[in-house]
Amino acid sequence: MAGSFHRVACGDCENEQVVFGKASSVVSCAVCGTTLATPTGGEAEFHGEIVETVEAR
């Protein structure tokens, strides 16, 4: 399975979290619970700022 991992910054609390680019479930911030990514059937829709691509495949 090809996909990338991204470091996403939460817009509410500035926590940074690594998220799979093709997430198949909703990803919430581990600190405040804000939604960081939602699945779309392909590449996830990110709701926070993508700080960097941690690992590209």
From Swiss-Prot:
List, alphabetically, the InterPro entries matched. Ribosomal_eS27 (IPR000592), Ribosomal_eS27_Zn-bd_dom_sf (IPR023407), Ribosomal_zn-bd (IPR011332)
Could you tell me what the cofactor note in this record states? Binds 1 zinc ion per subunit.
For the ligand (Zn(2+)), the binding residues are 10, 13, 29, 32
Task: Write down any Gene Ontology CC term.
Answer: ribonucleoprotein complex
Q: What is the required cofactor set for this protein?
A: Zn(2+)
Keyword DNA-binding on this protein? Answer: no
Q: Which UniProt keywords apply?
A: Metal-binding, Ribonucleoprotein, Ribosomal protein, Zinc, Zinc-finger
In residue numbers, the zinc fingers (C4-type) are 10-32
Q: Which HAMAP family match?
A: Ribosomal_eS27
Q: What is this protein called?
A: Small ribosomal subunit protein eS27
Organism of this sequence: Halorubrum lacusprofundi (strain ATCC 49239 / DSM 5036 / JCM 8891 / ACAM 34)
Gene name for this UniProt entry: rps27e
